[in-house]
């Protein structure tokens, strides 16, 4: 007799680890991203910047339990979307095992995936700070999560056509980082440049704390994506830390070469770039491969931020595309190069004799990037035509905290 999910035996160790991992990933958004981004903006915009991440988490949480999870992870329909048979969580039992993680409860897997959806849209906010209407941002969250994140998550993780193609993404290189980075690029194209495009961090201490919380939370992000408390989680944990450390050191070296001094902002940017790049590869690569991935990714992101952005003239305020988009692309491609079958039998990369894996990775990168860019442009155009995307010039110059929220971050 075939065992059903109701008959599956839940594992208390796996469940405990995944509860911790889910909380760790939540910590990345609230308050990790909020603090990281908030410290990098002008003091007149710190509350608005932080609130963009907080409200993204709240709105996405509602979308996810209403319909988002089911469309992303429901039974596959023609490779493109999931079947919404359990809308509003109807039919999901307290002790029902998750279909994609049969040793943990379904509710826990739903919550874990919720934190990924929330941080993805929160990351986009870093590109549009200091000039986007809050009302437009609220509408953008609903439309983007529904029309971009949910389908892409299904294609890669929910049994959709990219999964069927064999594309690997252990914890979100395509679904989270390429998706958010390219969407950010599309949105800033529509918004245009700020009146003052200088990066003037008003409190780098906030950003250091935020980056530290991101680094800490990323162990839940990557090691948690093993979905069990076993050897694969431990391997993902170690390679995640290795890539982050290599990314930080690499960016500091680039700072020395360009300006002659190390910068704190450069160090934390490099760590985040390393974390982004190892995300798709964390459950597939060795420690030496993680070291290479981290060292290389900071060079790529550094060049994107320092040379590509000014050459192309787009105003990605906090370099979401330069760090998340570019490092996500490199990490996804690197997975196709370095995936080791003795780490995870699901992946064999080019250097271990499987060029087809690299091909699958490149296709996934191209498909997700193209879809995210085009649909984000359409969403942005629609919002610009209806509610308007951008605040007034007066509001932008005087700061969004007082004009949009009637509050101020500091009373000194």
Curated annotation (Swiss-Prot):
Subcellular location as annotated: Cell membrane
A GO cellular component entry from the record: plasma membrane
Transmembrane segments: 16-36, 46-66, 71-91, 107-127, 137-157, 170-190, 204-224, 234-254, 276-296, 320-340, 360-380
UniProt KW keywords: Ammonia transport, Cell membrane, Membrane, Transmembrane, Transmembrane helix, Transport
Record-linked PROSITE patterns: AMMONIUM_TRANSP (PS01219)
Membrane topology: Multi-pass membrane protein
Keyword Transmembrane helix: yes
MF GO annotations: ammonium channel activity
Pfam family, one: Ammonium_transp
Family: Belongs to the ammonia transporter channel (TC 1.A.11.2) family.
Protein name according to UniProt: Putative ammonium transporter MTH_663
């Amino acid at each position: 007799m075939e065992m059903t999910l109701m008959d599956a035996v839940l594992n208390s160790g796996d469940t405990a680890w995944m509860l911790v991992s889910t909380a760790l990933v939540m910590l990345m958004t609230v308050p990790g991203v909020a603090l990281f981004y908030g410290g990098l903006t002008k003091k007149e915009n710190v509350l608005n910047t932080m609130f963009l991440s907080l409200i993204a988490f709240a709105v996405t949480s509602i979308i996810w339990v209403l319909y988002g999870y089911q469309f992303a992870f429901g039974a596959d329909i023609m490779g493109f979307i999931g079947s919404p048979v359990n809308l509003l969580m109807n039919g999901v039992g307290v002790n029902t095992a998750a279909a994609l993680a049969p040793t943990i409860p379904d509710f826990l897997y739903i919550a874990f995936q919720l934190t990924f959806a929330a941080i993805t849209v929160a990351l986009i906010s870093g590109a549009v700070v200091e000039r986007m209407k809050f009302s437009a941002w609220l509408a953008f969250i609903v439309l983007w999560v529904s029309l971009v994140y949910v389908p892409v998550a299904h294609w890669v993780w929910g049994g959709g056509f990219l999964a069927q193609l064999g594309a690997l993404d252990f914890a979100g290189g395509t679904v989270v980082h390429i998706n958010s980075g390219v969407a950010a690029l599309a949105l800033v194209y529509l918004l245009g440049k700020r009146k003052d495009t200088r990066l003037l961090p008003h409190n780098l201490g906030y950003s250091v704390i935020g980056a530290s919380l991101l680094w800490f939370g990323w162990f839940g992000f990557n090691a948690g994506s093993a979905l069990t408390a076993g050897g694969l989680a431990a391997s993902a944990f170690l390679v995640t830390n290795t890539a982050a450390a290599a990314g930080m050191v690499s960016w500091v070296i680039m700072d020395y070469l360009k300006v002659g001094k190390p910068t704190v902002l450069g160090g934390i940017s490099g760590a985040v770039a390393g974390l982004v790049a190892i995300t798709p590869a964390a459950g597939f690569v060795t420690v030496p491969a993680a070291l290479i991935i981290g060292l290389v990714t900071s060079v790529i992101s550094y060049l994107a931020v320092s040379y590509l952005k000014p050459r192309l003239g787009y105003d990605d305020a906090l370099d979401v595309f330069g760090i998340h988009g570019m490092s996500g692309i490199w990490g996804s491609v690197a997975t196709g190069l370095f995936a080791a079958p003795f780490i995870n039998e699901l992946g064999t990369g080019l250097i271990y004799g499987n060029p087809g894996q690299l091909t699958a990775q490149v296709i996934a990168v191209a498909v997700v990037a193209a879809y995210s860019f085009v649909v984000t442009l359409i969403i942005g155009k629609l919002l610009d035509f209806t509610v308007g995307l951008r605040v007034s010039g007066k509001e932008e110059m005087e700061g969004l905290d007082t004009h949009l929220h009637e509050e101020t971050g500091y009373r000194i």
